[in-house]
């Protein structure tokens, strides 16, 4: 199969959330919104029943990996789970009985990309509490994908989560951890490793020859010379100095409260922040329906919509597919970017 003919591999996500219905809606909008070919890995009968329940005119076709692109114009291609597992789910009622199918879908998507049968992984939202009830040991998608990438003797990768939109791109240095643990986890080494991965992937994946990074402070006023906390002075500033000595264009630590207004955003490509919410609050405020989660540092392309399972609206026909469509389109562009082109970045658009 030629590389340009490979479909995207879309995971099932939590079947009690909005993942299945936004996948159906994305297929419906394939022509209008320029959605690239994708195959969903799950249970064809469940997707068919979901379409019927929502009143969506979406034909579903069970496929083999090589058939997806040919089928995509006329039906939503669904690749059954390798185990043949069936999915039974009620919208808005998460059930740990589906945990095995959720995890299997993610693993199968990665395997398709690693085998060359798919061009990139796009993941539908999962609920961590559903999986942890059955012993899932990873804080989230990002960390699990890093573990999958480390199989077969590969060097474990540091999972780096970038939220990308047409308005702003951000990277939290610490991800799915309690806020009280951030000061102990926020080491100079972690900041340096994260920034190096961001710098390398912006060059390799997006084609930015000279990425511009900025690092926000952890404390108010970036610590104000240690009077409001010492992490900015003792951890973040030394990391920036080392990175700059390596030729990486990075500034900081800068006060987080003045980092995201329009003029400031024009001065950098990606903002790194010490905590999860420092990054996600501004990007979700500015681009709630269009944000895309991109995992950096993996040997394959992975994106996902920048929202959760939305159990409260699942099955009600209220979920918007915009973020999933953006994730599908960006994954396709990243996987098929010609070597001599640069993908548009918010501050350079």
From Swiss-Prot:
Listed binding positions for a divalent metal cation are 176, 221, 276
Q: Which SUPFAM superfamilies match?
A: Isocitrate/Isopropylmalate dehydrogenase-like
Q: What class of enzyme is it?
A: oxidoreductase
Give the pathway listed in the UniProt entry for this protein: Cofactor biosynthesis; pyridoxine 5'-phosphate biosynthesis; pyridoxine 5'-phosphate from D-erythrose 4-phosphate: step 4/5
Annotated cofactor note: Binds 1 divalent metal cation per subunit. Can use ions such as Zn(2+), Mg(2+) or Co(2+).
- Positions annotated to bind substrate: 141-142, 284, 293, 302
The EC number(s) attached to this protein equal 1.1.1.262
Could you give a single Gene Ontology term from the biological process aspect?
Answer: pyridoxine biosynthetic process
A GO cellular component annotated for this chain's UniProt record is:
cytoplasm
| The keyword NAD belongs to this UniProt entry's keyword annotation | yes
- Which cofactors? Zn(2+); Mg(2+); Co(2+)
Query: So what does this thing catalyse?
Result: 4-(phosphooxy)-L-threonine + NAD(+) = 3-amino-2-oxopropyl phosphate + CO2 + NADH
UniProt keyword annotations, A-Z: Cobalt, Cytoplasm, Magnesium, Metal-binding, NAD, NADP, Oxidoreductase, Pyridoxine biosynthesis, Zinc
Q: What does this protein do?
A: Catalyzes the NAD(P)-dependent oxidation of 4-(phosphooxy)-L-threonine (HTP) into 2-amino-3-oxo-4-(phosphooxy)butyric acid which spontaneously decarboxylates to form 3-amino-2-oxopropyl phosphate (AHAP).
Task: Give the PANTHER family listed for this entry.
Answer: 4-HYDROXYTHREONINE-4-PHOSPHATE DEHYDROGENASE (PTHR30004), D-THREONATE 4-PHOSPHATE DEHYDROGENASE (PTHR30004:SF6)
Protein family membership: Belongs to the PdxA family.
- Quaternary structure per UniProt? Homodimer.
Q: Reproduce the miscellaneous comment text.
A: The active site is located at the dimer interface.
Protein name, as recorded:
4-hydroxythreonine-4-phosphate dehydrogenase
> Origin organism of this chain?
Methylorubrum extorquens (strain CM4 / NCIMB 13688)
Record gene name: pdxA
């Amino acid at each position: 199969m030629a590389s340009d003919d490979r479909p995207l591999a879309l995971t099932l996500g939590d079947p009690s959330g909005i993942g299945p219905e936004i996948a159906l809606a994305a297929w419906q909008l394939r022509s209008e919104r320029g959605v690239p070919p994708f195959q969903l890995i799950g249970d064809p009968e469940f997707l068919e029943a979901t379409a019927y329940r929502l009143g969506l005119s979406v034909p579903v076709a069970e496929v083999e990996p090589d058939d997806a692109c040919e089928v995509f114009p006329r039906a939503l291609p669904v690749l059954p789970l390798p185990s043949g597992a069936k999915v039974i789910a009620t919208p808005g009622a998460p059930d740990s009985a589906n945990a095995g199918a959720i995890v299997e879908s993610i693993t199968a998507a990665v395997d398709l990309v690693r085998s060359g049968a798919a061009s990139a992984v796009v993941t539908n939202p999962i609920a961590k509490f559903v999986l942890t009830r059955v012993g899932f040991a990873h804080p989230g998608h990002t960390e699990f994908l890093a573990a999958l990438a480390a199989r077969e003797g590969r060097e474990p990768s540091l999972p780096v989560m970038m939220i990308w939109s047409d308005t702003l791109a951000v990277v939290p240095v610490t991800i799915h951890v309690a806020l009280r643990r951030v000061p102990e986890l926020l080491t100079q080494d972690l900041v340096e490793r994260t920034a190096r991965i961001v710098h390398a992937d912006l060059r390799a994946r997006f084609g930015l020859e000279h990425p511009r990074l900025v690092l926000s402070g952890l404390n108010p006023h970036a610590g104000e010379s240690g009077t409001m906390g010492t992490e900015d002075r003792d951890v973040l500033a030394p990391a920036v100095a080392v990175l700059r000595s390596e030729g990486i264009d990075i500034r900081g630590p800068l006060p987080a409260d003045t980092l995201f207004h329009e003029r400031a955003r024009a001065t950098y490509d990606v903002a790194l922040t010490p905590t999860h919410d420092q990054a996600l609050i501004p990007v979700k405020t500015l681009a709630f329906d269009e944000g895309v989660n991109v995992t950096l540092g993996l040997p394959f392309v992975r994106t996902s919509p920048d929202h959760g399972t939305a159990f409260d609206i699942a099955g009600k026909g209220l979920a918007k597919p915009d973020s999933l469509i953006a994730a599908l389109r960006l994954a396709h562009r990243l996987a098929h970017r010609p070597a001599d082109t640069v993908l548009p970045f918010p501050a350079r658009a």
